Amino acid sequence: MLDGLKMEENFQSAIETSASFSSLLGRAVSPKSVCEGCQRVISDRFLLRLNDSFWHEQCVQCASCKEPLETTCFYRDKKLYCKYHYEKLFAVKCGGCFEAIAPNEFVMRAQKSVYHLSCFCCCVCERQLQKGDEFVLKEGQLLCKGDYEKERELLSLVSPAASDSGKSDDEESLCKSAHGAGKGASEDGKDHKRPKRPRTILTTQQRRAFKASFEVSSKPCRKVRETLAAETGLSVRVVQVWFQNQRAKMKKLARRQQQQQQDQQNTQRLTSAQTNGSGNAGMEGIMNPYTTLPTPQQLLAIEQSVYNSDPFRQGLTPPQMPGDHMHPYGAEPLFHDLDSDDTSLSNLGDCFLATSEAGPLQSRVGNPIDHLYSMQNSYFTS
């Protein structure tokens, strides 16, 4: 019985000792702890804690080189890195050599770009720019004031249609700065001091190397240009001018293609508008013959303005005829009396047209008052 009690006491003391030892080394693993690296439940007795997250011991390694991290580490985007790869991936890079800049290095700034002191130099003459020097940052490349002015002068002399002429590929790949300078000196006879630069003709191998590099990047860095110059045996300036001319050529082709697309769209719009206009013109041509005739009211108004239908209002004495004392100014009794005479007015019906048959042209045949006067004169003279 005493032996059993002693064994139980020893077991409890061993448990307390192990608990105190685990509290010194690390935290006991709870069944709900999940590793931040592999997203699995941690079943180990001990774990590592980084930035309020739990990790397996074997998961604490660099995400780039897979080396285990023992003393220090860098944490970014839920990943761990060693010092070397963290500085290589996320440190500020030089705008010239694209290498990482150490925190203890001196730098030169140009707008948003940062450069090493040795990399802060002109890309043409490779002269290191000092504090206070004037320079130009063009397409991510540094140019001193003198080289920038020379480049502007050379580019202004380049003919814009030189790349689109019907020449061979070798002639199109000439160094256009030299060609433009020679052309400008020949056209301007007054400027005899400007020397003609030699024309550089590229071989097929050189042109292929340039085009392959242009497909990778249209704006290569200084190291790539120096490598191409060493491979092709040309100067860095020739390589730089070729890339500038090639970029200008691609932009011009893109603008020309866009202009052609706009012209096609405008042509289609004009064609559709002309088609619709011809359809409307056909309908107007069909309706025009019927719309040109004047209306009956217009015909009557014209005839009434020519002939005066009421002569008795002008102060004339009305003619005296048998039976006119009943209707001195009326026309209907006069017509009835005249129609009763078959000898002298037998052709009176031939002089008038029926209103229903003549229509608006009745007023053009003659005024009934005029016919009445003519028949009256013939009646009294007979």
UniProtKB/Swiss-Prot annotation:
GO biological process, one term: central nervous system development
SUPFAM superfamilies membership: Glucocorticoid receptor-like (DNA-binding domain), Homeodomain-like
UniProt-recorded Gene Ontology molecular function terms: DNA-binding transcription activator activity, RNA polymerase II-specific; metal ion binding; RNA polymerase II transcription regulatory region sequence-specific DNA binding
Region called Disordered, residue ranges: 161-208, 252-286
Major localisation: nucleus
DNA-binding region, residue range(s): 195-254
This protein's GO CC annotations: nucleus
CDD domains named in the record: homeodomain (cd00086), LIM1_Lmx1a (cd09370), LIM2_Lmx1a_Lmx1b (cd09378)
Key words, A-Z: Activator, Developmental protein, DNA-binding, Homeobox, LIM domain, Metal-binding, Nucleus, Repeat, Transcription, Transcription regulation, Zinc
Biased composition (Low complexity): 256-269
Domain LIM zinc-binding residues, every copy: 33-92, 92-154
Subcellular localization, as worded in the UniProt entry: Nucleus
A Pfam family it matches: LIM
Disease: Defects in Lmx1a are the cause of the spontaneous neurologic mutant mouse, called 'dreher' (dr) and results from a failure of the roof plate to develop.
Function description: Acts as a transcriptional activator by binding to an A/T-rich sequence, the FLAT element, in the insulin gene promoter. Required for development of the roof plate and, in turn, for specification of dorsal cell fates in the CNS and developing vertebrae.
Protein name per the record: LIM homeobox transcription factor 1-alpha
Organism lineage: Eukaryota, Metazoa, Chordata, Craniata, Vertebrata
